[in-house]
Amino acid sequence: RSLQADRAIVDALKRAGARVTFGSGHLLTVGCAEERLRGFEFDATDCPDLFPALAALAAFCEGVTVLRGTTRLTHKESDRAATIAAEFSKLGVSIDLSQEDRMVIRGLSTPDDGLTVRDASLDSHNDHRIAMATAVASLRADRPVTISNAQAVDKSYPQFWNDLKQLYY
């Protein structure tokens, strides 16, 4: 049991239809419990640092995801709500911020869909969590993507790029 607010990611994954199991040594394994992940509702007010990762998850869920708590995002390393919407839109992900304190994300229609890149030049805005979330979302892009200021990940996860390469390639 973690005291970290970010542990709520487990609940979000389950709401999306993921199967989450815990192993020894704090190992967490995530797989699809259903044929495809589905849009979900989640209140991230108490865990605002999860928004970038939740946006990446929602991009690959069928249907609409509603994340609450966006007012907590304006004073992070970047205005995270606006940054997430701007950078993910370059990947073809529709994010609506017009509802008060909500981020509404329209996911891909089928699990075989890839992201249709509109602009292959993303920017982390020197925000480590934005850099990691856009990198993960870019794995399903229909063409190569570059992320400016990608070294921002060094703030919290210096091994991120090596670990992502090992997991994905």
In which residue ranges do the predicted regions lie?
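Short, structured segments at the rim of ligand-binding sites
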Residues: 1-169
